[in-house]
């Protein structure tokens, strides 16, 4: 189930994004990027509709994923 990111308290949203970024450990190429920059990038992807917040009833967790991969 998609959770509208706009419905979350801004601090809660930031915490979810930060947790996601730290968990993913994505390689950003030749230059390391700050946590704040990574969080800002994910937030922009949510705002543009490229990524979605997804609640998993099975695992009782929230995840962030590309909208194109969500098939719920």
Curated annotation (Swiss-Prot):
Transmembrane segments: none
InterPro entries linked: UPF0270, YehU-like_sf
Pfam families, alphabetized: UPF0270 (PF06794)
HAMAP family (alphabetical): UPF0270
Family per similarity comment: Belongs to the UPF0270 family.
Name the record gives this protein: UPF0270 protein KPN78578_37030
Biological classification of the source: Bacteria, Pseudomonadati, Pseudomonadota, Gammaproteobacteria, Enterobacterales
């Amino acid at each position: 189930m998609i959770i509208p990111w706009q419905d979350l308290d801004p601090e809660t949203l930031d915490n979810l994004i930060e947790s996601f970024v730290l968990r993913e450990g994505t390689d950003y190429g030749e230059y390391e990027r700050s946590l704040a920059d990574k969080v800002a990038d994910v937030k922009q992807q949510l705002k543009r509709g490229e990524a979605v917040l997804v609640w998993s009833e099975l695992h009782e967790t929230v995840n962030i994923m590309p909208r194109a991969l969500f098939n719920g």
